[in-house]
Structure formats: structure tokens, C-alpha cells
From Swiss-Prot:
It comes from Zymomonas mobilis subsp. mobilis (strain ATCC 31821 / ZM4 / CP4). This is RNA pyrophosphohydrolase. Belongs to the Nudix hydrolase family. RppH subfamily. Pfam families: NUDIX (PF00293). Keywords: Hydrolase. The lineage of its organism: Bacteria, Pseudomonadati, Pseudomonadota, Alphaproteobacteria, Sphingomonadales.
Length: 155
């Protein structure tokens, strides 16, 4: 499946006032699968617009409650395991190619609502940045280590 392309998307490392990172548990997997908010870009959508749209769709957090700090220097990639490649994306994509953003959350915990129109998460929490690689699914661990490395000066 090396000839398949990467799906273009965005992700966000959202920090609260205590420099803890927002992490949420997916509701479409049997095992616990925690991650930061992420998603695909729509046609002709800029990464900045896309990441704020995805964040609001997944968490109910509107753009006015977020201050973008920076983004990764390059687009980062990861490959899907074969079973996910087949089940989630019908073997259309090899994995994802994402631009990641670092942002400050300006709202309150009560403003977060994962029970959206199309809920993607069943739980959420604030975690220490260094906990992320051990919290998420194994195939995303190298990606999360790159994200942490790139944003380390701001954490």
C-alpha cells in the first residue's frame, strides 16, 4: 500500500492556563484511544481555518476561545495500521499528512462540550505534555514525539 497517498489534515495541541494539554478518548474504537483533536481539511480550506473548524466540531470550543501560538515547521506524516487503512478509509489513504498547531485555550472547562452533533469522543481530560506519547495509540507515538519536540520551547 506504499503507493497510496496521505490524507491532508490538521491537528491542535491545546494548552490550558496550567500548560496542560487537552486529550480526548475516541468513541469509535474498542480499546481506549486517546488523542489531541485532529481532522481532515476540506476542499480549498486553509490549515488555520480547518484546525479551528475541527476543534469546534469535536469539542464545541469556538474560535474566539482559542489563541494560536504557532504551528509545526513542516507537515508531519504517519501511516495507518493495515486494519484501520481498510476499515476507516477503504484503502484510499496510506496515512495522514498533518500540519499541527499549538494554541492557548481561553475558555473554561465548562465551555468544552464533546457531546456534539456527531460525537467523536467519549471522554476528555487535561494531561501533562510528557504523558501524551504513552497515552495515545502506538502507531501515533512517533508523531506525538515529533509534535512535542517541535513545541517544547513553548510548553
Amino acid at each position: 500500500m506504499d503507493n497510496l497517498e496521505y490524507r491532508s489534515g490538521v491537528g491542535i495541541m491545546l494548552l490550558n492556563k496550567d500548560n496542560l494539554v487537552f486529550a480526548a478518548c475516541r468513541n469509535d474504537m474498542k480499546e481506549e484511544a486517546w488523542q489531541m483533536p485532529q481532522g481532515g481539511l476540506e476542499a480549498k480550506e486553509t490549515p488555520e481555518v480547518g484546525v479551528l473548524r475541527e476543534l469546534e466540531e469535536e469539542t464545541g470550543i469556538p474560535p474566539r476561545m482559542v489563541a494560536i501560538i504557532s504551528h509545526t515547521k513542516e507537515w508531519l506524516t504517519y501511516d495507518f495500521p493495515a486494519d484501520l487503512q481498510a476499515s476507516f478509509f477503504k484503502n484510499k489513504y496510506r496515512g495522514q499528512r498533518q500540519l499541527w498547531f499549538l494554541a492557548r485555550y481561553l475558555g473554561r472547562d465548562e465551555d468544552i462540550n464533546i457531546n456534539t452533533d456527531k460525537p467523536e469522543f467519549r471522554a476528555w481530560k487535561w494531561v501533562e505534555p510528557k504523558q501524551l506519547p504513552d497515552l495515545i495509540v502506538a502507531f501515533k507515538k512517533p508523531l506525538y514525539e515529533k509534535i512535542l519536540s517541535e513545541f517544547s520551547a513553548s510548553l
